[in-house]
């Protein structure tokens, strides 16, 4: 809701009022409308107490990371931020992406293959924008084994 004066102390959650761009470890859950994205990641039934979690369904999780609109939106937002920095070379963008997503720099082989993939995404189709190409790269990085699993 619009407010004439923004007072963070009067709000339940900090961040923008529309909820965009906020990182969170805690989510407000509604019993009647649980987050659909987290259901694939073994979200417990909010209507029942659960002492033990069920086994996870890894194929459903992989499909959620590939197809969920939330994941596509996050990849698109990351691409917009990357493209706004017009002076950076593709290799520099990829190094920054690896640092942000995986906490490390890519090795030479990874940098070469990811640069080739970014170039392939960008040249696949004349209508494909720079943002769409980098969104595809970000989406692919979200689906790497190293991004999904903790060591």
Please tell me what each predicted stretch does:
Residues 1-101, 105, 132, 136, ...:
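An acidic, gly/pro-interrupted, aromatic-rich
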Residues 122-125, 145:
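Structural motif corresponding to the C-terminal cap of alpha-helices
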Residues 112-123:
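Amphipathic alpha-helical segments that form the core helices of the histone-fold
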Residues 126-130:
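Short glycine/proline/serine/threonine-rich loop/turn segments at secondary-structure transition edges
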């Amino acid at each position: 809701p619009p407010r004439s004066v923004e007072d963070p102390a009067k709000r339940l959650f900090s961040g923008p009022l529309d909820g965009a761009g906020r990182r969170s470890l805690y989510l407000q859950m509604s019993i009647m409308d649980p987050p659909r994205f987290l259901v694939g990641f073994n979200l417990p039934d909010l209507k029942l107490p659960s002492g033990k979690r069920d086994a996870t369904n890894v194929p459903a999780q992989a499909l959620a990371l590939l197809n969920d609109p939330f994941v596509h939106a996050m990849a698109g937002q990351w691409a917009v931020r990357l493209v706004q920095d017009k002076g950076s070379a593709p290799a520099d963008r990829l190094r920054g992406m690896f640092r942000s997503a995986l906490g490390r720099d890519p090795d030479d082989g990874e940098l070469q293959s990811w640069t080739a993939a970014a170039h392939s995404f960008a040249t696949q189709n004349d209508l494909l924008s720079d943002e769409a190409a980098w969104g595809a790269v970000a989406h692919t990085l979200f689906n790497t084994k190293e991004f999904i699993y903790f060591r």
